[in-house]
Amino acid sequence: VQVISSYDQFKQVTGGDKVVVIDFWATWCGPCKMIGPVFEKISDTPAGDKVGFYKVDVDEQSQIAQEVGIRAMPTFVFFKNGQKIDTVVGADPSKLQAAITQHSA
């Protein structure tokens, strides 16, 4: 899982033809801390080889969070070819796993 630390990096990461999932989180968000390790664990599964895993701190990268329309944390957003293709809102491991499985197929 890589941290996105600039808007340019965000555009580069989301613009490719590989599906990427970005965890939009905040340091002060309890549920984010709870699901963070789950996100890391899923990235180490076979699905993780087919999907790029990234994190964005919404406080450090407010421009990205605003452009994507993040209103709650954590929010997991899937991108392919520069387009948002799916969103999972909240710290729900089974929903997150299901979406990652679906997009890695």
Curated annotation (Swiss-Prot):
Participates in various redox reactions through the reversible oxidation of its active center dithiol to a disulfide and catalyzes dithiol-disulfide exchange reactions. Disulfide bonds join 29-32. It holds the Pfam family Thioredoxin. GO terms for molecular function: protein-disulfide reductase activity. The active site is at residues 29, 32. Belongs to the thioredoxin family. InterPro entries: Thioredoxin, Thioredoxin-like_sf, Thioredoxin_CS, Thioredoxin_domain. The record marks 23 as: Deprotonates C-terminal active site Cys. Gene3D superfamilies: Glutaredoxin. Keywords: Allergen, Disulfide bond, Redox-active center. Residues 1-105 form the Thioredoxin domain. Monomer. This is Thioredoxin. The record marks 30-31 as: Contributes to redox potential value. It comes from the Eukaryota.
